[in-house]
């Protein structure tokens, strides 16, 4: 894949386009290609929270198309790394929480779901004012209770 250099403003505009495409895309392979392009742009500006957030949004769109547990786990790990880098960003944390919930819905082993729930609990404790993260945590607790 040809790496193209962008300035920050152009990179944000390009990521906006990639996000829009990933939201409309139904093909997983095409969405993976969009996520890869987004990763390349993110790696050019790894300190930009705005770039990281758009990359996170594209990863969430990809996660909704992933059926295989291993693929989804890889995507969740990428979001976890983004969240660790931008620890104080409730927006990036929310996108990580969304993928954790998606992951929990694919997991079949109780211990796996509990480990995912613990990660969501930690996010919810850090971002107590985020009703959106709390909602994802409540949903995973509901899953565990059934």
Show which residues each predicted segment covers.
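Amphipathic alpha-helical repeat scaffolds of TPR domains
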Residues: 4-23, 47-64, 90-104, 131-145
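Alpha-solenoid repeat scaffolds
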Residues: 25, 29, 48, 65-70, ...
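Intrinsically disordered, low-complexity polyampholyte segments enriched for Lys and acidic residues
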Residues: 3-5, 28, 61, 81, ...
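Helix-turn-helix repeat elements of alpha-solenoid scaffolds
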Residues: 24-40, 67-78, 109-119
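A conserved position within tetratricopeptide repeats
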Residues: 2, 35, 39-42, 46-49, ...
